[in-house]
């Protein structure tokens, strides 16, 4: 079983130290994202956000048996090479960090370690896959606790894929031109009705119900960032979100796991956001 098979259908959690990583692992997370500050703190602090300290990442790698991911800035292939050198399992070329390049993303085909990238629509998803991404995630709006953008992006991608399946084959060439990707990628979506890589949800997931909603909308799994360790009872909320993803279509179980979780993260309403991270890297 390769790493993508292990991750599919699961929850990936942001952690900032080995203790949090162990909480995530014990709760049933399929992987953890190692970073010095969770997105809510990155958003609050402002300034330039960069790759995390390799020493901290290595400590988290040692602490858990599940795969460990870490973020690099968009276009920063040197940060990516550093993470590959320390043995990271998966790299997230992330709009949550300050972009290093306004034009180019990392050429992910040159790396052995797999990459995940964010997308708001099918065009962005296919361009990242062309560059070598092995997983796509909705960008959402990280660090807000507001799921509305993740919902918007997932619905957009799913809608555009459904539209592609209805096109005549000769119309696919125009679609490929519009998406700025090779014909073969458009043809794959046309034939299969899905992306050639897993499509996870990220950005604003804060409750078991949020996580279940994203799976209903087509997510192959869920990233949860600030929603766990900014909440009142991280261990209980983490386990509840894992159970919600596995039982997304069972309202009785969802009701059970949603009880007595303590306060959710306070969050930021969409209208209050000053920095729109999801607009980075198209």
Swiss-Prot record:
Keywords: Lyase, Pyridoxal phosphate, Schiff base. CDD domains: pdxS (cd04727). InterPro entries: Aldolase_TIM (IPR013785), PdxS/SNZ (IPR001852), PdxS/SNZ_N (IPR033755), RibuloseP-bd_barrel (IPR011060). Its EC number is 4.3.3.6. Disulfide bonds: none annotated. PROSITE patterns: PDXS_SNZ_1, PDXS_SNZ_2. In the presence of PdxT, forms a dodecamer of heterodimers. This is Pyridoxal 5'-phosphate synthase subunit PdxS.
